[in-house]
């Protein structure tokens, strides 16, 4: 039973683990969608409620598994209690039997004691009779004492045997009583343990009831959360419909704004043409007056040649206007040059910071172009945190080709900032989930507003530049229009500076996070390099030790081979010596046998 409970407890957490994995995957997908399309507070609230629901469901599952385990343990304890109660009943029955046996034995002991007392009294009476008999024998002639004492001694022996048997029975009964007392003590202990287990079971039942109440409360909370979720879903649907309507209205307003701006541009072009025509008329009048004066003065003498005062005043006024216009143009050009130089310096500094931040992690540099491609292939609505779509909508008649380089640099910086943001999301998670999405939604809104303002400012600058080009050909402007232009340019520069400062702050934060991530990666790489160096040192030491051992083994093998060769040489020498000895022995024996035979033949010859 306990093994089954443990298996249930071990298998139960697998479901929540899978749910956690799915929750993390869904959260990552929601964060990616929030990054691409912006985040709404309603969506954030919905995700939070869904997370709470999942947590409650997980807690419910855990509580149910605990309840099942407790129920199984309760059943096991109930079975154990039932078994203990059965054993207790059996022990009580045995106790009753032993008590009845003890009572019967006690009665028998009392009877034996009474019989013993009676036997002692009979013994005393017999002794008294013996004394009387002895006294009577002295007086009278009586039968022999042995005849009287024999039956009495036989009775005494029988009584003593019965007394010994009764004493043995008493000892056995004492042993049985001691055993029963020990069994009673064990039974009392088991009863106490059973009572403690029963108390534990009662406590567990109380805990189960509390858990059931908590489960009911959780069910009610889940129902309330379901209702709230349904309400939030309905509100989200309504809000999504209103958002769609507002988007359609914004699109319509953008189209109308584009049309209005086209008309304004056309009117401005017509006004510029009118001003150029007026300038050309003034120049034509001046030239005509000069020609008329020249023609009129041809027939006069050199002393009589005079220019009329009106013509001289008109020419003077015309030249003063052109000089003032040129001065205003010089001032505007100086201002634009200064602002462009400042912007150039700022952009160069920011590009250096970006390059320093992007050069650090090689993985980040390899990921950036792929992400840029995905952004360029995808919808260009939030390419620069919500403002690129409005930029593309504001130029339906081919105005994208006429934009200034500052706008191009701004759009490239915004796209690079979005890429850096996305890369920083993958490398360093330095912000929390909910606050990050809310901050990003705020940043998207502000960035879109500021970039829309910057696009309007760029278009105003373009119209001003075109107007200046036409004025270089010969337009005359008043000082009020010049002051208005300077005010517009300062406002546009301020808006551009606001956008650049906003992007600079964002990029600076991302650069700091990237530098931190790079520093952490460098530290991890250094640690890995140190570990690799340590392993390489260990490998070198092991290889050296292996080489030393191999050299030792080779030396030992060479020594063994030398010893074996020496042993072989010794054996060969011994074999050769034995062979030589055997060959010498055979030769000497042959010589001796030959000499013996010759001597014998000589002796025989001499004998003959």
UniProtKB/Swiss-Prot annotation:
Region (Disordered): 1-23, 354-493, 570-608
Coiled-coil annotated residue ranges, if any: 40-346, 542-576
One annotated Gene Ontology cellular component of this protein: microtubule
Localization in the cell: Cytoplasm, Cytoskeleton
Biased composition annotated in UniProt, kind: Polar residues: 363-379, 476-493
Primary localization class, coarse: cytoplasm
A Gene Ontology biological process term: cytoskeleton organization
Annotated InterPro entries: MAP70
Region (Required for targeting to microtubules): 224-458
Cross-referenced Pfam families: MAP70
GO molecular function, one term: microtubule binding
Recorded superkingdom: Eukaryota
Purpose of the protein: Plant-specific protein that interact with microtubules.
Record family assignment: Belongs to the MAP70 family.
Protein known as: Microtubule-associated protein 70-3
Gene name of the record: MAP70.3
